[in-house]
Amino acid sequence: MVRLKEDFYVPYSLPGAKTENLNNTIVYFIQETLSPARLAGEILLVHETLDQSVENRKAWIYNPGQRRVRRAPNVAFDNPGTNSDNLRTSDQLDIYNGSPERYDWKLVGKKEILVPYNAYKLHSDKVKYADILKKNHINQDLARYELHRVWVVESTLKQGMSHLYSRRTLYVDEDSWQILAVDCYDRRGQLYRVQEGHVINYYDLPTVWTTLETTFDLSNGRYLALGLDNEEPQTYDFSAKFSTANFQPSALTRRGVRRRVQAVLGVLRLRRQRKFFAGVETLRETQNDRE
């Protein structure tokens, strides 16, 4: 189990936003690894560019061991996704992301299929991770599938281009435009991996957002579950206030230093607690001896 903290800033969705004022950047993204300890402290920063034929995606990684920030040009396309145990590619985060340039795209049409939807049971704080994560697949008693109209979009790898997936079929919700499922085919044309986006409707915002993203590897029976928050004290906070200043490479170093200070303070508190409890235990032993 890997715990992550992710921040998004999407300036193109702000009222009155105009593409010419976005500096060709539509999404700012930070992913910070909180646990386990062997991975904790690594921070990924991405500036997602609008027109990647003009300027490629920009990415940086903060390494807590080296305490330095470096460029990360490989955070794209079919390079392994961070903290995924090689079960997804970089462009599979949020179901699909990044430049479409390696594929030819075709709008096949509209059809009705069963898709993950209204996943409120999977989102419930009454449910534990162990209730959801089962061998080979998630607990289907908690998942919900509904018959919905979706747009079917096919992407086929261009001649001369390289990618782990030779073809993808995306199923895009007619109402929300959220990608709900993807079939990913290997270089031999065989179905290789299947993605699902289990969504809920935040009526108060309003928006539709995934509460769980899954990627199933049919070649080995393993799967990746991303976005679980059932046991966390806080779920998605759509009211967070950000600016581009929060998403600069220099901010990664400050964030890393802050985490190290918090970690040191946590160790000091733990040592004080251990010393206190050791004293209590000694006192009890002494009292027992007297008795």
Where are these regions (language model features)?
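N-terminal leader/targeting segments and the immediate start of mature chains
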Residues: 1-30
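Short, solvent-exposed polar/charged micro-motifs at secondary-structure junctions
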Residues: 1-2, 82, 115-117
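Gly/Pro-enriched, hydrophobic low-complexity segments
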Residues: 30-39, 44-100, 136-240
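A broadly tuned "polar low-complexity/structure-edge" signature
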Residues: 41-46, 107-108, 264
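Mature hydrolase/peptidase catalytic cores and their serpin-fold inhibitory cores, especially
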Residues: 100-166, 249-261
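Secretory-pathway-linked proteins and extracytosolic
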Residues: 221-265, 284
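A cross-taxon signal for low-complexity, glycine/charged-rich
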Residues: 266, 271-275, 282-287
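Arg/Gly-rich low-complexity intrinsically disordered repeat tracts
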Residues: 290-291
